[in-house]
């Protein structure tokens, strides 16, 4: 579901919101790479739902460029494929906990969406995602509330920027939202439910490019 509207009483800034369900497949094979030595190939099926939002600059009647921040909740099934080399991976025991089972996780993404016409958009982004060993609901909820509160505090500051300098608002929103998300995910590299005591998750970082058709 996509919604665009003019923002902050200007004719050149829009508020872009995109809520979605998705199913994806990610694999080393898509990049034409094979595991060497202790390296491990993986193939991951993932589904979930998310929300993408941002403020953008109108370039015409329908065209716009939109720096965005996105957050998803998802479930992943990862199939780890070991190298044929006779070598032992020190993380093999941990990886076996995830192998070919569905696990809960979250991700955040920052990028730029270029809207050509109402029905066609191009995306380029950088995503950080984590897959939990176990879903400890109360610890996860506490960590999520801390992140949501921090994002809410940023919204107040960003609103002040828009009121004083609307043209700078979309860039400030993009930088601050994604900087906070990046920092939170760094803290979760060792504790998946930071700041609460919990195991380290599996983490994926990747660049993404895509095309979105709107019907």
What are these regions (language model features)?
Residues 23-46, 76-105, 135-144, 182-202, ...:
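Extracellular/periplasm-exposed beta-strand and loop segments of Gram-negative cell-envelope proteins
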Residues 1-4, 45-57, 71-73, 108-114, ...:
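Residues on the lipid-exposed face of transmembrane beta-strands in outer-membrane beta-barrel proteins
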Residues 58-62, 115-119:
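Outer-membrane beta-barrel channels and translocator barrels
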Residues 65-67, 106, 120:
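Hydrophobic core residues within well-ordered beta-strands of beta-rich domains
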Residues 117-215:
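Predominantly the C-terminal beta-signal and adjacent terminal strand-loop region
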């Amino acid at each position: 579901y996509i919604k665009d509207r003019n923002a902050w009483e200007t004719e050149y800034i829009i508020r872009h919101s995109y809520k979605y369900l998705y199913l994806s497949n990610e694999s080393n094979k898509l990049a034409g790479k094979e595991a060497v030595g202790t390296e491990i190939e993986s193939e991951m099926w993932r589904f979930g739902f998310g929300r993408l939002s941002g403020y953008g600059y109108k370039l015409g009647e329908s065209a716009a460029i939109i720096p965005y921040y996105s957050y998803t909740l998802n479930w992943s099934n990862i199939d780890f494929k070991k190298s044929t080399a006779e070598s032992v991976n020190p993380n093999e025991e941990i990886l076996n906990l995830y192998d070919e089972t569905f696990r809960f996780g979250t991700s955040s993404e920052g990028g730029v969406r270029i809207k050509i016409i109402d029905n066609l958009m191009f995306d380029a982004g950088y995503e950080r995602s984590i897959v939990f060993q176990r879903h400890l609901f109360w610890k996860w909820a506490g960590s999520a509330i801390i992140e949501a509160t921090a994002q809410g505090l940023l919204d107040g500051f960003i609103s002040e920027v828009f009121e004083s300098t609307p043209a700078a608002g979309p860039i400030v929103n993009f930088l601050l939202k994604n900087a906070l998300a990046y920092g939170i995910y760094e803290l979760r590299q060792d504790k998946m439910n930071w700041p609460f005591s919990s195991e380290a998750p599996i983490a994926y970082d990747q660049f993404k490019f895509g095309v979105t058709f709107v019907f």
